[in-house]
Amino acid sequence: MIKAEKLSYSFPQKELYNKVSFTIEDNVHCAFIGTNGTGKSTLVDMILHPDDHLYEGKLTMDVPGRIGYVSQFYSLDEEKEETVFTYLSETFVQLQNQINEICDAMATAEDLEPLMEKYQTVMDEFQAIDGDFYESNIHKQLKVAGLKDYEDKLLTHLSGGEFKLVQVIREMMISPKFIIMDEPDVFLDFEHLNALKDL
């Protein structure tokens, strides 16, 4: 649940919110609608990073688990030849590498207890995001998004709408309890917008 109570926030020469209150309950979809410059992205950033902003009122975030976030801005490294599959696999591969490193350390360690605790923590995190089946889950999600033949395609070769869908898939695959999308329909044509709804 996210709850704002009499939230006020302003820039030096512009007031964005004046005693705004709202509640976003669990298991619901909510959209903030407004023209450019009305503070939608600022509100998202306040929810994600409340300590970075000076505001009046109360902002409460009670989300027991991961929070996913899809930004409206993302710059790709044109020199980095990364495929869709590699991009979607990154979190899982990092956790697998951590598990392997811990196992290697356990082979020569005299005190196994701290390593066992670390191993269990990383393994729990891996299993919480269905890590054993991440490859098949990537296939399934790309198919739902209408991108089933895109696994080996370079990110730099995707259209804006295609990359937006891949971003959403990446966040959804870490099994967030709550996901925030800033301007999720940016770059999406009608076909890709329907694919976003299917995800």
Regions found by a protein language model. Give the residues of each.
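ABC ATP-binding cassette signature C-motif
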Residues: 1-199
